């Protein structure tokens, strides 16, 4: 197995009030040789073995990117749109497109206000709306595949994905105190 790639980052103060920061990771994550063991219900308990070569490592997207737009309209107030893209990921090491988590893009909205006082050094009020567009996507899961002969005696492969959905639009408020 091997992993190789490159990561690029950009931070820019566009104006006094507007900042952009982003990054992208491009990678190749490969398994040179992989043996898939699959339950065979015709000879259960028994297994079939399928050999794979040069496949993608599971849960290792080839592309991950973020782009954040921060606006500072007045002193101590920050408003931001935070965007994250994650490329396609496989549930196992077979690189089978039917055993994958689709790529996704999510956008969050954040407001951050800071107050300075004599008693408390810093009071930070935060409000975040996660998944602003209510995108339906998965972030994790697993696959179960088995083989069994059909009514004609032909061996068939059956595969099921079990995916963990991400939260729909939700929010968080926070208060941080520094003494």
Where do the model's predicted regions map?
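Outer-membrane beta-barrel domain signature
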Residues: 52-56, 96-100, 160-162
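Residues that define the transmembrane beta-barrel architecture of outer-membrane proteins
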Residues: 2-4, 59-63, 103-107, 167-171
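Short, glycine/charged-enriched secondary-structure capping and boundary segments
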Residues: 37, 96, 141-143
């Amino acid at each position: 197995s091997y992993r190789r790639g490159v990561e690029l980052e950009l931070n820019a103060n566009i104006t006094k009030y507007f900042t952009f920061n982003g990054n992208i990771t491009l990678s190749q994550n490969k398994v040179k040789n992989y043996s898939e063991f699959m339950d065979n219900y015709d000879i259960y308990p028994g297994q079939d073995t399928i050999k794979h070569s040069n496949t993608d490592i599971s849960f290792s997207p080839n592309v991950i990117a973020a782009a954040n737009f921060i606006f500072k309209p007045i002193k101590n107030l920050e408003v931001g749109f935070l965007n994250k893209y994650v490329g396609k990921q496989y549930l196992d090491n077979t690189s089978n497109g039917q055993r994958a988590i689709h790529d996704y893009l999510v956008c969050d909205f954040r407001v951050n206000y800071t107050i300075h006082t004599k008693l408390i050094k810093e009071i930070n009020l935060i409000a975040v709306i996660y998944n602003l567009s209510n995108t339906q996507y998965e972030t994790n899961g697993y696959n179960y595949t088995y083989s069994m002969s059909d009514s004609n005696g032909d061996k068939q492969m059956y595969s099921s994905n079990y995916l963990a959905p991400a939260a729909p639009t939700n929010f968080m408020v926070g208060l941080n105190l520094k003494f």
